[in-house]
Amino acid sequence: VNTKPVRVAFQGEPGAFSEAAAVGLLGEAIETVPRPTFDRTFAAIGDGAADLLMVPIENSLAGSVLRVFDLLLDHNLAIRAETVLPIAHDLIGCPGATLAGIRSVESHPMALAQCERLIAAHPEWKRIPAEDTAGSVREVLARGDRSCAAIAGTRAAKHYGGVVLASNVQDNARNF
């Protein structure tokens, strides 16, 4: 009996929304394989690092993820399953941080745009674009600066030991 966990590659860092989608669809027993780009995620199948991929093909607000469709064709891969993941953004800071003490917020540009109301309510906040939502949490926590916060999902806060300063800060709850 093969007891090795299924290895699932995803684009992003541990705590990313795609990792949450993989675990939600396939269960906690999988081994997640983070990759920095979609190209590297798809390459994980060919180089034997992963058995499956979890990649977004569409976002209800941003539309189709065209690069993923191109890579599906380039690698001759087929979609085997689908899941819908609600995208809920949290404002995440270091332990000891307070909402009143925040002076900068970082995240992927799409996440920053999806949380415009929160950010606009705090004109003193500097916006800092990042490559990845979960990666922005990792960076904020690594710096330990209580005046910095990141926008990402709850999974990233738990993974990196961040504190959720505000929950569900996205402008549109119908983001999947």
Indicate where each model-derived feature is located.
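Domain-level signature for soluble enzymes in the chorismate/prephenate branch of the shikimate pathway
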Residues: 1-176
